[in-house]
Amino acid sequence: VSLLFDEFIKLEKATEKVVVSPPQVQQPEIKASGKRIQVNLLDSLKANTTYTIDFSDAIVDNNEGNPLGNFTFTFSTGTQIDTMEVSGTVLDASNLEPIKGILVGLHSNLNDSAFTKLPFDRVARTDSRGRFSIRGVAPGKYRIYGLMDADQTFTFNQKSEVIAFNDSLVIPRMEERIRMDTAWVDSLTYDTIVERKYMHYLPDDLILRAFKEF
């Protein structure tokens, strides 16, 4: 995957921040040169699957270091792109503080054993506020888990790993909403208010509480 930007850019902590979904067991090679980012996916790609490459705030401009926040590139190996999103927050169960950098994943296999035996179907990573958004999700029913994935297997296989979960089934959906946009004449006077329709993805308020087994 080759991405061309309109200014010189660089990557910061790409191995920590960039998340490919579905997850890649063999970590991708990600390099920036001039105005271009090259992503080499080393795992075989699944057929008829939507892939997302979430850069978080890893892309910054070369001069001032300003991040291009929440940039995600999406492509499909099939004829359509899945567009559903699932969002929420991961909190430390002991003090309800947000947890940064924990992996959050969906399983379409609803058996509890899937968390320990199968890699996630789709993944995201939490930001500094503990927020996550899993993109490119297909319609269906899912279990959702959080995992501080020490060995990068995308499965819970070490009791030392921090985990999180939500008891409810996750069923992605979307609804049409209206956003009010204002056209201003100057800083004090507005000209018109325009209603714009957009699609909002749900659920967007999932709470996962993280803990470590003893």
What do these predicted regions represent?
Residues 153:
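Acidic carboxylate motifs that coordinate Ca2+ or other divalent cations, activating on Asp/Glu
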Residues 1-129, 133-136, 141-147, 159-174, ...:
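Acidic, low-complexity Ser/Thr/Gly/Pro-rich repeat segments typical of extracellular/periplasmic
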